[in-house]
Amino acid sequence: MKRTGKGEKKPAFSRGGRAVALLVAFFVVLAILPQARQWDQEPTGEAAESQPVSAVQTELADTKQEAARFTVCLDPGHGGNDSGCVYGKRHESDDALTMAKLVKKYLEQENVQVVLTRTKDKYVELSERAQCANQANADYFVSIHRNLNPLGCGVETWTRADYSKESNALAEAIQKRMVKVGVQQNRGVKHGTQESASSSYYVLRKTKMPGVLIELGFIDNQKDNQLLDKHKKAYAKAIAKGIIQTYEKYHGEGEKSATNETKSK
């Protein structure tokens, strides 16, 4: 047997030792390999439940909502330096905005998407109001106002002079439900403008969808003001229900309105 001297490396393993080392390494690889192959597989059972949810998955879950049934553009009349009708400290622009926000609330509770032409006491051009509704591709346009006349009282709803059946139905549904809540006088559904039956209010003329303009009583009539203050939530619900009733009648559930108003001459 050869002896090892100074400067000569001693073998680390004998033949038997190398065989044992290789055998141990083989079993180690067998133990690790199944786990290494699972990195790209979906976890199941308890493993799946213990997996952390990624930020992307959380965001997708949070934003996954039921699609809106349809879209309504609510237009609170006047605003900013245009107060509309004024009686004492009471401004038409304030009453209109309060009502629009309430109607919005009740419509959204019924999964209806709502767009407001203004959300605060701000002046908005009539052309911008119409543009807001058209760009939103709204199914309906509802403008909210108040009247002024020392001899007048009651609630009325207007459509365009060249109104469509759907616009008229929308006006009728809203007017009927408000009257049921309680008004001093039912002034009915009217077509055109106060000045001319052959003309139309700008916002109704320039919007491409069925639309109405509501006059919520006379601001200079004490009884009308009392009724509005007492029943404002009920009026808002009546308007919202009238809108939904009309949409369901003409389009059913899940359909997008394809009806556009006929352009005015």
Task: Annotate each predicted stretch with a short phrase.
Residues 18-35:
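Hydrophobic membrane-insertion alpha-helices, especially the h-region
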Residues 101-112, 134-138, 146, 175-183, ...:
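Sec-exported extracytoplasmic/periplasmic mature domains
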Residues 92-95, 99, 103, 126-132, ...:
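Stable alpha-helical elements in mature extracytoplasmic
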Residues 136, 141-144, 192-265:
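Active-site-adjacent mobile loop/cap segments within catalytic or ligand-binding domains
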Residues 32-50, 55, 254:
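Sec-dependent signal peptide cleavage junction
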Residues 49-130:
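Active-site histidine-acidic residue metal-binding/catalytic motifs
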Residues 73-86, 120-178, 194-220:
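Active-site microenvironments of hydrolase-like enzyme catalytic domains
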Residues 1-16, 24:
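N-terminal Lys/Arg-rich, disordered targeting/topogenic segments
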